[in-house]
Design a protein with these regions (language model features):
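Cytochrome P450
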Residues: 1-214
Length: 214
């Protein structure tokens, strides 16, 4: 962050480092907390989405075949996986004024729960919403990271990590098969896959190279 103050760039860290409050640059403890928040926000969703995508690849083998045949689908596949997995289950908000949304009246100070997973499978937005479709033309319209001013700070990091991870994984292990064993941590906020048992197959497609937990 100190470097971004001396050598500003066109990125988020520079924006934070150069921000001012009451005419003064933000204190160091705020800067440290900000970049740590970005890293953790991007890492947690990435881990759960990575495991969830591997599970989807086993459940929808025809989609896995499409990606293996055309790796350029990986970025859109990552968006579609985020839609299907919805790593953050919900978020709570407080209405700051009386409002009406789609016919539903919302009073000032009323608490609301936003169910991202439900929105991401809205059939009016995503036809055949329960299908994992790596070619879906509006996959990026998902709300896995929220929306507007409260959109997750780690969204870009998470997307970059997913894309790079699957480029490497599919290059080394073209066939990854979920064994059906998994451990879901009890968590009301995030879709926490703490363990996913898989078989990794090398390019020869003969036998599992190793059994791993993702």
């Amino acid at each position: 962050m100190a470097d971004r103050r001396l050598n500003p760039r066109a990125d988020l860290l520079t924006t934070i480092a150069q921000s001012k409050l009451n005419g003064e640059l933000l204190p160091q403890e705020f800067l440290d907390g900000s970049w740590l928040l970005i890293i953790f926000a991007g890492n947690d969703t990435s881990r759960n989405s990575l495991s969830g995508t591997i599970r989807l690849m086993t459940q929808f083998p025809e989609q896995r075949a499409l990606v293996l045949e055309d790796p350029s689908l990986i970025p859109n596949m990552s968006e579609e996986a985020l839609r299907m997995v919805s790593p953050v289950i919900h978020m709570r908000r407080t209405a700051i004024q009386d409002s009406e949304l789609n016919g539903q009246r919302i009073a000032e100070d009323e608490k609301l729960v936003l169910w991202y997973g439900a929105a991401n499978r809205d059939p009016e937005v995503f036809p055949n919403p329960d299908k994992f479709d790596v070619s879906r033309d509006n996959a990026e319209k998902h709300l896995a990271f929220g929306h507007g001013v409260h959109k997750c700070l780690g969204s870009r990091i998470a997307k970059m990590q997913l894309r790079m991870a699957f480029e490497r994984i599919f290059d080394r292990f073209p066939q990854i098969v979920w064994t059906g064993k998994q451990t879901i941590s009890p968590n009301a906020l995030v879709h926490a896959i703490s363990s996913l048992r898989v078989n990794l197959y090398g390019p020869n497609k003969k036998r599992p190279v190793i059994v791993q937990n993702l």
